[in-house]
Amino acid sequence: MAVITMIEAQKRSGRYNVYLDGAYAFPVSESVLVDFRLAKGMEVDKALTAQLIDADNVAKAYNRALDYLSQQLRTEKEVRDKLADLEIPAETIAATLQRLRSLALVDDAHYAASYVRTMMHTGDKGPRVIRQNLRHKGVLEQPIDEALTLYTTEEQLTVGTAVAAKLAKRYQRQPFGTQQQKIRQGLLTRGFDNDLATKMLATLDLTPDEDEQWALLVKQGEKLWHRYRTLSMRERQYKTKQALYRKGFNLDDISRWLADLGESAQ
């Protein structure tokens, strides 16, 4: 059985070299040194040596994890993936995560709640997208469900209505029907449900600017009328009317414009 003859501090803080029977044997971290009460004169067999090396590997992985966690909150999956990228063995990662959990340094339920609160106050996403993001980060359904209870209907309406107002401004030069469709689609894409999107649109109480809508219709209509110039008059009118309606213009306005066009052509 070998005997520890010297424990020497490395230049790196918190790291030590252990010598057995006068020869360098292996390095350990300060936490391993303390946990195993290593001291000069202590006997060390092969089993203990292997145990010390394993413990040191966990200690090094733990420190890598702490560095990663110091930047921001992380999920277990994010920490696991980071350590795996560093080519740390799976069993060492498992032991490291167990230690992190015991110290509440990784806690997916806490992460999910924090993420939801942050998205409520600084983001523009609804519950569905938030759920997808948390799933992608490896959080299980139960903690996601619990965290999303923080995002009440009232909070969703507040966030979503602000998003809808920005979208309304972005699409204000579109046909009114198209503007409405794009606002709704933007809300759905961001994870709000359809019923709430309807309420958000109602809260905005948008009304079309008749003069602006008419000018847009005339501009688009003239382009389409020219595009279908080779068709018969009946088919030309039908195609133009259909295309303008698909673009979101009011059907009565389209009919009026076509009637005016017909009169001017006579």
Curated annotation (Swiss-Prot):
InterPro entries in alphabetical order: RecX_HTH_1st, RecX_HTH_2nd, RecX_HTH_3rd, Regulatory_RecX, WH-like_DNA-bd_sf
Subcellular location: Cytoplasm
UniProt gene name: recX
GO CC field: cytoplasm
Protein role: Modulates RecA activity.
PANTHER family: REGULATORY PROTEIN RECX FAMILY PROTEIN
Protein name: Regulatory protein RecX
Family recorded in the similarity comment: Belongs to the RecX family.
GO biological process: regulation of DNA repair
Disulfide-bond pairs as recorded: none
Keyword field: Cytoplasm
